């Protein structure tokens, strides 16, 4: 419910409105219905009535808030809103004036110092001490006092601070004259002062933080630099005095602005529209000023960003140079390189790189100098209460950090230069890789192996392209990887000089053919019988890898896989067997075996062998002519082999010469000659003079497709083929290759050797007469290991 007094006042105002607007009848009726109305208060007494005045104000506000669409176009409303906006901007400008003025003072102070230093010729290091105010220039002005300083008691020597409503709490208006500037610095500077061991070197992260703070503060200053209007001259004068400056410290634009404000306030007050127009003009002028300052600050920030990017790239280049393979190589170089020959002059491209690096360093130093000058122009401040000693001390701490950082950069660049030069010199001096310890593949580079290599004779240290000299055998200290022995050079035996330098006739260019399962089975059986017979007779099968003195010297281990691969590379084209040199092949004839009194070979009787002399030596001149004709088509090595057999035959015993025994074996059918086409690849068994066993083993073989004529006799089979004449009782069927099995047990009482000294009958004791030996009977046979072992 509305109280009676308020209702009565409203009735009085209604009656007053009716009377003043000449509604007489209505006023009389209203007074009769509500008598005894109080009088109108003097403040509400208006010429047109208080009720009308109130209604006009209410209606204007109502239209602004809930009016029609055309109400926003009202110029009066626009002026009112502009007025409110100007009032807000003035408050911000009032809070930012100290910062702007201090920046101008710092710039002026720094210019004076530069002029003095230029006259005195001070070095660049002292300019840095006064010019590095980047960190402390901006932060000291904005973070000097926290909000709690406002409630602290103040001493008699300090000027009182205005309340928080008059200014922003984060930005001070008055500074205590006796306050220490170091206590008002940014916390980062306090951290530098509190670092142990006097290390006032800011890290990269701290420098980046300081740069970010500077950028943020510059942007805030740009947004808050708005003209100051609506303040009384006394308030403006108080504000300027509180800052510690006067009109002389302001720039030309600010002085003009203050003069305009004073003129406007001294003039009589005009209408509200004129004031708003003046304020808009002032806003335009101030916006132009702000845009100009903002452009300058953006240029400065871009320069700072470029300098920081150059510093970061310089750090990255130095770190990458330290981590590069060239730097690592230079660190690992040994000191004996100092005694090496002088390095040749660097390549022109290397000189260009060094020149580019030098140019980059000089450019970096110039950029650092520009950064220090620009930082000093922005951050160096001129404070009335701050003495020159304290300013030098505060800037000296920051300068020490930057100077140490620059020294470290220069030291790193110098070290990288030296390492690059050293790496180039050492890289050019290492022209011969073999002289630096490089050896053949597969060998470990140990110290003892290098010593052995240095102790080799000259003919082995520098192998010629024509011959291959394997590396020397390392000692056992090299481990199992380096343990291998060279294959002993097979010197020719004194017993067989003619065959020592010849290769086997079976080492041909013809590739081996695959055998059927039946053939392989026969070969396996024949090999098994050979080993069994050797065990019973005490005879050891000759081996390719054995040297001529295999009975007296210990066995040496085989070479490693690498030596075998090198030997495989020396094969003749089109052959599956390695092409061994003249000294690498040693025919395993009975003459090449060592003669010792402890041999267990049994002597054979030659009774039936003498009966077959006519068959063995009965080759007609036609067959000999065919043999000579076929020998023309043979390889030169095979011709030499045949000549060797003939020369060996001449050195045989006198008993064989008297009997004209020709035990020369035919050439291997696997040889790529004209004779090899007359034989089949099937293996055959040879049983010397054992016709019964021979007929049992070869009864199942019926291959007669080669055009060979077989005649079965009592003790032998004569084979007639193109260029062939052999004793079949010795070599078996002609349809088989040389897969020979010797049944020695059946020949114990058959062999008989006759010599000048008498008739010797072999009884298995291994001893003979003076005229003949057991080895002479096998003199004409070439017991090569490859045709026997390979079979085909």
UniProtKB/Swiss-Prot annotation:
Residues 100-184, 286-400, 424-676, 692-724, 755-777 are annotated as: Disordered. It is found in: Nucleus. GO terms for molecular function: DNA binding; DNA-binding transcription activator activity. Keywords: DNA-binding, Nucleus, Transcription, Transcription regulation, Virulence. InterPro entries: LisH. It comes from the Eukaryota. Residues 100-129, 139-158, 286-308, 330-370, 383-400, 443-467, 524-537, 610-619, 697-721 have a biased composition (Low complexity). Residues 316-325, 425-435, 484-506, 538-549, 620-633 have a biased composition (Polar residues). Residues 6-38 form the LisH domain. The keyword Cytoplasm does not apply. Coiled coil: none annotated. One of its GO terms (cellular component) is nucleus. GO terms for biological process: cell growth mode switching, budding to filamentous; cellular developmental process; filamentous growth; filamentous growth of a population of unicellular organisms; filamentous growth of a population of unicellular organisms in response to biotic stimulus; filamentous growth of a population of unicellular organisms in response to chemical stimulus; hyphal growth; positive regulation of filamentous growth of a population of unicellular organisms in response to biotic stimulus. It holds the Pfam family LisH. Residues 637-652 have a biased composition (Basic and acidic residues). Residues 755-772 have a biased composition (Gly residues). Transcription factor which mediates CO(2) sensing. Required for CO(2)-induced white-to-opaque switching, as well as for filamentous growth and virulence. Required for both normoxic and hypoxic biofilm formation. Hypoxic biofilm formation is a major cause of perseverance and antifungal resistance during infections. Belongs to the FLO8 family. Interacts with EFG1 and MSS11. This is Transcriptional regulator of filamentous growth FLO8.
């Amino acid at each position: 419910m509305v109280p009676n007094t308020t209702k009565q006042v409203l009735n009085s105002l209604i009656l007053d409105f009716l009377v003043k607007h000449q509604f007489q009848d209505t006023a009389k009726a209203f007074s009769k219905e509500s008598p005894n109305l109080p009088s109108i208060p003097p403040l509400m007494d208006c010429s047109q009535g208080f009720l009308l005045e109130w209604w006009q104000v209410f209606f204007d506000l109502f239209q602004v808030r809930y009016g029609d669409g055309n109400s926003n176009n009202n110029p009066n409303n626009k002026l009112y809103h502009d007025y409110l906006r100007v009032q807000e901007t003035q408050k911000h400008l009032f809070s930012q004036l100290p910062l702007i003025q201090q920046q101008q003072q710092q710039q002026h102070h720094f210019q004076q110092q530069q002029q003095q230093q230029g006259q005195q010729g001070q070095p660049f290091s002292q300019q840095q001490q006064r010019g590095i105010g980047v960190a402390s220039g901006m932060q000291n002005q904005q973070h000097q006092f926290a909000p709690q300083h406002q409630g602290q008691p103040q001493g008699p020597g300090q000027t009182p601070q205005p309340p928080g409503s008059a200014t922003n709490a984060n930005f001070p208006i008055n500074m205590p004259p006796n306050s220490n500037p170091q206590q008002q610095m940014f916390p980062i500077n306090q951290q530098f002062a509190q670092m142990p061991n006097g290390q006032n070197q800011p890290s990269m992260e701290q420098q980046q933080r300081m740069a970010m703070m500077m950028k943020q503060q510059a942007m805030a200053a740009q947004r808050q630099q708005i003209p100051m209007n609506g303040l009384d001259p006394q308030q403006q004068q108080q504000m300027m005095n509180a800052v510690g400056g006067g009109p002389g410290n302001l720039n030309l634009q600010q002085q003009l602005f203050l003069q305009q404000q004073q003129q406007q306030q001294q003039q009589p007050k005009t209408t509200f529209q004129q004031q708003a127009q003046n304020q808009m003009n002032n806003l335009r002028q101030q916006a132009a000023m702000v845009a100009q300052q903002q452009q300058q600050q953006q240029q400065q920030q871009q320069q700072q960003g470029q300098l920081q990017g150059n510093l970061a790239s310089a750090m990255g280049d130095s770190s990458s140079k330290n981590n590069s393979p060239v730097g690592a190589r230079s660190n690992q170089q040994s000191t004996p390189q100092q005694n090496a020959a002088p390095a040749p002059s660097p390549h022109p491209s290397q000189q260009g790189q060094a020149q580019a690096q030098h140019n980059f360093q000089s450019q970096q130093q110039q950029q650092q100098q520009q950064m220090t000058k620009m930082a000093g122009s922005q951050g160096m401040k001129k404070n009335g209460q701050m003495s020159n000693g304290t300013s030098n001390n505060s800037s000296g701490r920051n300068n020490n950090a930057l100077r140490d950082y620059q020294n470290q950069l220069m030291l790193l660049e110098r070290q990288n230069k030296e390492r690059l030069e050293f790496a180039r010199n050492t890289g050019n001096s290492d022209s011969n890789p073999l002289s630096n310890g490089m050896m053949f593949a597969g060998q470990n580079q140990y110290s003892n192996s290098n010593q052995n290599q240095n102790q080799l004779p000259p003919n082995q240290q520098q192998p010629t392209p024509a011959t291959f000299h394997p590396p020397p055998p390392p000692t056992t200290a090299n481990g199992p990887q380096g343990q291998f022995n060279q294959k002993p050079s097979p010197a020719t035996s004194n017993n067989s000089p003619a065959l020592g330098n010849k290769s086997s006739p079976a080492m041909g260019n013809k590739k081996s053919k695959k055998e059927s399962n039946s053939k392989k089975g026969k070969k396996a059986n024949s090999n098994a019988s050979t080993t069994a017979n050797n065990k019973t007779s005490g005879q050891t099968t000759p081996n390719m890898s054995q040297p001529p003195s295999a009975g007296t010297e210990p066995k040496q281990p085989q070479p490693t896989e690498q030596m075998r691969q090198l030997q495989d590379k020396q094969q003749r084209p089109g052959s599956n067997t390695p092409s061994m040199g003249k000294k690498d092949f040693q025919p395993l004839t009975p003459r090449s075996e060592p003669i010792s009194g402890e041999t267990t070979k049994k002597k054979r009787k030659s009774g039936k062998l003498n009966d077959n002399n006519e068959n063995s030596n009965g080759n007609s001149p036609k067959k000999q002519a065919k043999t000579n004709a076929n020998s023309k088509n043979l390889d030169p090595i095979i011709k030499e082999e045949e000549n060797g057999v003939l020369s060996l035959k001449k050195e045989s015993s006198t008993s064989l010469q008297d009997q004209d025994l020709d035990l020369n074996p035919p050439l291997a059918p696997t040889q790529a000659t004209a004779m090899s086409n007359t034989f089949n690849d099937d293996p055959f068994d040879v049983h010397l003079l054992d016709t019964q066993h021979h007929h049992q083993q070869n009864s199942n073989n019926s291959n007669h497709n080669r055009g060979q004529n077989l005649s079965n006799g009592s003790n032998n089979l004569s084979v007639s083929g193109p260029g062939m004449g052999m004793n079949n009782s010795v070599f078996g069927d002609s349809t088989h290759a040389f897969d020979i099995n010797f049944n020695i047990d059946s020949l114990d009482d058959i062999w008989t050797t006759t010599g000048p000294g008498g008739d010797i009958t072999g009884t298995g004791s291994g001893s003979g007469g003076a005229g003949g030996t057991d080895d002479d009977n096998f003199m004409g046979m070439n017991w090569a290991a490859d045709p026997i072992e390979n079979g085909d």
